[in-house]
Amino acid sequence: MTYRAEYLWIDGAEPTAEIRSKTKILADGDEPGIWGYDGSSTNQATGDNSDVVLKPVFQCPDPIRGGENILVMCETFLTDKETPHPTNTRALARAAEEKYGDQDPWFGLEQEYTMIDPVSYTHLTLPTIRSV
């Protein structure tokens, strides 16, 4: 039997980063491995040197296809398979986590509001609001 591995990655950031994918048919028991694609079609390489390497970093069941099919989240690398592609922002996040992983992250949420006069649609300042 076989199953489908849907490789997913983030493409070049020009004009904006998008999710790309391609499917590989694997025999039962085979694990998804390193794969590649033509980076010139995703603004990640020039036509004369267009190979980009996909390295799997996470896999999970495919919720759309079901069965034994899986989604394979990938990072992009240059052809030496060691150097992250310049558009691989996950590599930067991984490096930061490795460096600062022993620290506890703190998050601060801020919600801003603007008071607008319903007649003139001008912004109301605090002294104006107090006089209303």
Which sequence ranges carry the predicted segments?
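Acidic/polar, glycine-rich intrinsically disordered N-terminal extensions of enzymes
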Residues: 1-100
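Acidic-residue sensor for enzyme active/binding pockets
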Residues: 75, 110-112
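Flexible, glycine/charged-enriched surface loops at secondary-structure junctions
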Residues: 101-110
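Short, conserved secondary-structure transition motifs
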Residues: 112-120
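Conserved small/polar residues in nucleotide/adenosyl-binding loops
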Residues: 122-128
